[in-house]
Amino acid sequence: MFYTALFGITIAFSFVVWGLAARQYFWPVLRGRGRADAVRPILYLHAFRFMGLTFLIPGVVSPDLASSFARPVAYGDLATAILALLALAMLDSKLSAASLWLFNIVGAVDLLNAYYQGNRISLVPGQLGATYVIPTLVVPLLLVTHALVFRILLRPQTQAIPRSLPHAA
């Protein structure tokens, strides 16, 4: 019970720190950018979610880690990494908004489901082995960035205003 409480406290602190960093540093930079430029660095970050496949590697995680937890978490991360790369490729296309919504909904649901499944099976933090840092440090960052993408997607889109208008002849 004590270690599970420490696990939860670690996650809570990460959410607080990443949330403060987002408010103080990330959002002030992103809010002044157009949609494509604002989401691009976030998509690159999420493209690394293939690292979730490490939940399937013996020796990295405990053999006692439930496969009913590890498999959906690993493959959900892989799917989200692929969706992030597809959204990056489509940033300048007519499918940009749709690909961003798909990436963001699937990615956020995947992370929330991972926390839910870990709680449902009463995951013992020690079973995570070297992947302990993923749910305690990385997932809070990823969820904060999903919130930023939702905020970017929900804000009104304005057309770019040319710096100078051509002179009438």
Role assignments for model-derived ranges:
Residues 1-18:
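Hydrophobic transmembrane alpha-helical segments in integral membrane proteins
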Residues 9-12, 130-146:
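Small-residue-rich transmembrane alpha-helices that serve as helix-helix interface/gating elements
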Residues 24-25, 55-64, 116-125:
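Juxtamembrane "helix-exit" motif on the non-cytosolic side of transmembrane helices
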Residues 26-39, 90-98, 158-159:
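Membrane-interface helix-boundary motifs at transmembrane edges
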Residues 52-65, 83-91:
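Membrane-helix exit/interface motif
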Residues 64-75, 99-102, 125-135:
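Non-cytosolic membrane-interface motifs at loop->transmembrane helix junctions
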Residues 76, 80, 84, 100-120, ...:
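Hydrophobic alpha-helical membrane segments
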Residues 79-94, 148-150:
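Alpha-helical transmembrane segments in multipass membrane proteins, preferentially the mid-helix core
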